[in-house]
């Protein structure tokens, strides 16, 4: 498991992402890129577009 903080864990092979509201969520990709909206994330090597709804290379 991955410890995001003292109270939050994510499964191995995922990435901890901190939302703008201070809530942790698990991105289902190892070394994922967390989007600013606090909901979405992208695979390693991709980044979020300005709407945080699409991943760009």
From Swiss-Prot:
Query: Secreted: present as a keyword of the record?
Result: yes
Instruction: Specify the domain of life of the species encoding this protein.
Output: Eukaryota
Where is the major localization of this protein?
Answer: secreted
In alphabetical order, the GO MF annotations are: cytokine activity
UniProt entry keywords in alphabetical sequence: Cytokine, Disulfide bond, Secreted
Identify the tissues in which this protein is expressed: Ubiquitous.
Report the InterPro entries cross-referenced here. Answer: Granulin (IPR000118), Granulin_fam (IPR039036), Granulin_sf (IPR037277)
Task: Please name the Pfam families in this protein's record.
Answer: Granulin
Q: Where is it localised?
A: Secreted
Q: List the disulfide bonds.
A: 4-16, 10-26
Q: Name one GO cellular component term.
A: extracellular space
Its PTM note reads: Granulins are disulfide bridged.
Keyword field contains Magnesium: no
What this chain does, per the entry, is described as: Granulins have possible cytokine-like activity. They may play a role in inflammation, wound repair, and tissue remodeling.
Q: Which family does it belong to?
A: Belongs to the granulin family.
What is the protein name stated in its UniProt record? Granulin-1
* Organism field: Cyprinus carpio (Common carp)
């Amino acid at each position: 498991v991955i410890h995001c903080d003292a109270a939050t864990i994510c499964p191995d092979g995922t990435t901890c992402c901190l939302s703008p509201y201070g809530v942790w969520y698990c991105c289902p990709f190892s070394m994922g890129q967390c989007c600013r909206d606090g909901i979405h994330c992208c695979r390693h090597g991709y980044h979020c577009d300005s709407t945080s709804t699409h991943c760009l290379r």
